[in-house]
UniProtKB/Swiss-Prot annotation:
This protein's encoding gene: Btg2
Official protein name in the record: Protein BTG2
Assigned protein family: Belongs to the BTG family.
GO molecular function, one term: transcription corepressor activity
UniProt function note: Anti-proliferative protein; the function is mediated by association with deadenylase subunits of the CCR4-NOT complex. Activates mRNA deadenylation in a CNOT6 and CNOT7-dependent manner. In vitro can inhibit deadenylase activity of CNOT7 and CNOT8. Involved in cell cycle regulation. Could be involved in the growth arrest and differentiation of the neuronal precursors. Modulates transcription regulation mediated by ESR1. Involved in mitochondrial depolarization and neurite outgrowth.
UniProt keyword annotation of Mitochondrion present: no
Annotated GO biological process: anterior/posterior pattern specification; associative learning; cellular response to phorbol 13-acetate 12-myristate; central nervous system neuron development; dentate gyrus development; DNA damage response; negative regulation of apoptotic process; negative regulation of cell population proliferation
UniProt modified residues of type Phosphoserine: S147, S149
Entry-linked SUPFAM superfamilies: BTG domain-like
Subunit structure: Interacts with PRKCABP. Interacts with CNOT7 and CNOT8; indicative for an association with the CCR4-NOT complex. Interacts with PIN1, inducing mitochondrial depolarization.
Organism: Mus musculus (Mouse)
UniProt induction comment: By nerve growth factor and tumors promoters.
Length: 158
């Protein structure tokens, strides 16, 4: 799919916000009203956080800065937004995976649950001039794999 030069980050942020909101929804305990407030606040927070770190012409540039990470320690952006809807740190840790990496890059949003989990793509759009030679944070992590990663749809049951 080709497209004109796009500088907005709305589709990517919407994919990331939708994914995180669905994790909270699936695990229960959060009302739809609170989820809507969470989603709007997270969209605003990520848009603000990424505004000087979004480079559609070089999608891998700034990838580490845009990465949302939970590694037994909650990502500060998620933590701040969750506190706005009254979710405490212990509640967040119960509702979200203890190991989650969410990459929000121009033209692609992907995630991995667990340190050795498969990387799954949530959103993908082909850039105008694809530069396949660049190593993104995600691609660097995949270099050591002996077999290709398998993409699975994650389902969480309560």
């Amino acid at each position: 799919m080709s497209h004109g030069k796009r500088t907005d980050m709305l589709p990517e942020i919407a994919a990331a916000v939708g994914f995180l909101s669905s994790l909270l929804r699936t695990r229960g305990c959060v009302s739809e009203q609170r989820l809507k407030v969470f989603s709007r606040a997270l969209q605003d927070a990520l848009t603000d956080h990424y505004k000087h770190h979004w480079f559609p012409e070089k999608p891998s540039k700034g990838s580490g800065y845009r990465c949302i990470r939970i590694n037994h320690k909650m990502d500060p952006i998620i933590s701040k937004v969750a506190s706005q809807i009254g979710l405490s740190q212990p509640q967040l840790h119960r509702l979200l995976p203890s190991e989650l990496t969410l990459w929000v890059d121009p033209y692609e949003v992907s995630y991995r649950i667990g340190e050795d989990g498969s990387i799954c793509v949530l959103y993908e759009e082909a850039p105008v001039a694809a530069s396949y030679g660049l190593l993104t944070c995600k691609n660097q992590m995949m270099l050591g794999r002996s077999s290709p990663s398998k993409n699975y749809v994650m389902a969480v049951s309560s």
